[in-house]
């Protein structure tokens, strides 16, 4: 075993926990420094989901992806900051304070995997692991100017991921370039018997830049209302670059986009209200002295342990699942979700990948979006891929006012290789 010391100048607050001295072995990632999002279990290292309620929780086991990384020789150097339990788009909803965008400390890095993106963008680590429930890898990748992949649902084991919304979230890689991302992905993808949703589809692929004959779907909805015209123009130029390399752009539509955001928030909050019911604040988190009933004590522990946004989403989800509202909200959300899947299936009969902006705008200022509904709207372009379970990637494609813009590429089920090749081709074409 070899040793590595890690004392980063973390001026952007990318990390919650760092490991000063790391041991690592031989393998395809030998000595590669990797940061891990703090909702992914690491044996012997505090894992808090950036929440007070898990303060002091030290997992007795590693998540499957962490085991794979260690077996590949990676040096896991710390746990990164995030929006509490993955609920946010800015990494401002953390019990440990916000992470700053390395490119402009007055702006957010995106979320919820903002710490992972910031650590990579700031050059503190070679690559990072995040999780993506509705854009939580792709959003910070776009805002920080790095590459981030949400794999096809089931292609990476979720064993050891502290769940927020099981049917939506997926662990994925983040890196400064496509080749490094591909190397990391080749290690973490594959079957795991401990995750019932895991699929035996390992990733053993080296990116290629030949995209001759590739058909790129360009949905009208990705360039419509709510999208900054400057962002739209930068992304269209990126698609032009891909066309100059032999691809063909094909206009298309995703009519179900108008339902996607509502369906997503009903689904994810419903699943969160169930998943987070187990956190009682008794074993970990802040001590709340009370002589009241167990019911009151449980309520006070959770109020003290959970942040405002987490409490809001638990309440929303509980409401959606209530007997009198289940059909009105949750069942309708699942119908809309199927419509999104159907739209992707229809489009992918005629095209190979879908391209558009990752985010409607560039990274906004810290504290700028205090209205929750306004914040939720920024997920409009990323949630459809999670609802459908298809792979999606963000790659930097230009800048506006010195801040990066992300090109989002979405692929067919289990055709992660194709969107990675497309991103690699674009990266090489711009170089």
Curated annotation (Swiss-Prot):
Its EC number is 6.3.5.7. Belongs to the amidase family. GatA subfamily. The active site is at 37 (charge relay system), 112 (charge relay system), 136 (acyl-ester intermediate). Keywords: ATP-binding, Ligase, Nucleotide-binding, Protein biosynthesis. It catalyses: L-glutamyl-tRNA(Gln) + L-glutamine + ATP + H2O = L-glutaminyl-tRNA(Gln) + L-glutamate + ADP + phosphate + H(+). This is Glutamyl-tRNA(Gln) amidotransferase subunit A. It is an enzyme of class 6 (ligase). GO terms for molecular function: ATP binding; glutaminyl-tRNA synthase (glutamine-hydrolyzing) activity. Heterotrimer of A, B and C subunits. It comes from Methanospirillum hungatei JF-1 (strain ATCC 27890 / DSM 864 / NBRC 100397 / JF-1). One of its GO terms (cellular component) is glutamyl-tRNA(Gln) amidotransferase complex. SUPFAM superfamilies: Amidase signature (AS) enzymes. InterPro entries: Amidase, Amidase_CS, Amidase_dom, AS_sf, GatA. PROSITE patterns: AMIDASES. It comes from the Archaea. Allows the formation of correctly charged Gln-tRNA(Gln) through the transamidation of misacylated Glu-tRNA(Gln) in organisms which lack glutaminyl-tRNA synthetase. The reaction takes place in the presence of glutamine and ATP through an activated gamma-phospho-Glu-tRNA(Gln).
């Amino acid at each position: 075993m070899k040793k590595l010391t890690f004392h980063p100048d973390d001026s952007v607050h990318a990390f919650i926990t760092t490991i000063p001295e790391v041991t690592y072995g031989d393998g395809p990632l030998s000595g590669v420094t990797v940061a891990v999002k703090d909702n992914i279990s690491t044996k012997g290292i505090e894992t808090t989901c950036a929440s007070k309620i898990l303060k002091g929780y030290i997992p007795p086991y590693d998540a499957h992806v962490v085991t794979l990384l260690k077996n590949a020789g990676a040096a896991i150097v710390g746990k990164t900051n995030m929006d509490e339990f993955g609920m946010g788009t800015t990494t401002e909803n953390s019990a440990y304070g916000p992470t700053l965008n390395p490119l402009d400390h007055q702006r957010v890095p995106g979320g919820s995997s903002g710490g992972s993106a910031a650590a990579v963008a700031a050059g503190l680590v070679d690559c990072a692991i995040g999780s993506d429930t509705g854009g939580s890898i792709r959003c910070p990748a776009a805002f920080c100017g790095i590459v981030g992949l949400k794999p096809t649902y089931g292609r990476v084991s979720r064993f050891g991921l502290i769940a927020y919304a099981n049917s939506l979230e997926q662990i994925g890689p983040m890196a400064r370039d496509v080749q490094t991302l591909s190397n990391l992905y080749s290690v973490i993808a594959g079957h795991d018997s401990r995750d019932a949703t895991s699929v035996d589809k390992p990733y053993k692929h080296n990116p290629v830049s030949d995209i001759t004959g590739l058909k790129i779907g360009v949905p009208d909805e990705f360039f419509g209302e709510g999208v900054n015209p400057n962002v739209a123009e930068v992304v269209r130029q990126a698609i032009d670059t891909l066309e100059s390399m032999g691809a063909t752009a094909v206009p298309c539509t995703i009519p179900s986009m108008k339902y996607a955001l509502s369906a997503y928030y009903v689904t994810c909050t419903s699943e969160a209200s169930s998943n987070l019911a187990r956190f009682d604040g008794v074993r970990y988190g802040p001590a709340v002295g009370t002589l009241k009933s167990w019911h009151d004590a449980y309520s006070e522990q959770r109020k003290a342990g959970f942040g405002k946004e987490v409490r809001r989403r638990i309440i929303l989800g509980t409401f959606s699942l209530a007997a009198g509202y289940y059909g009105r909200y949750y069942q309708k959300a699942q119908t809309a979700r199927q419509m999104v899947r159907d739209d992707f299936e229809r489009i992918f009969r005629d095209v190979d990948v879908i391209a558009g902006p990752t985010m409607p705008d560039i990274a906004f200022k810290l504290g700028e979006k205090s209205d929750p509904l306004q914040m939720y709207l920024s997920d409009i372009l990323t949630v459809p891929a999670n609802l459908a379970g298809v792979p999606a990637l963000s790659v930097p494609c230009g800048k506006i006012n010195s801040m990066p813009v992300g090109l989002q590429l979405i692929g067919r089920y289990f055709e992660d290789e194709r969107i990675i090749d497309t991103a690699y081709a674009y990266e090489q074409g711009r170089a």
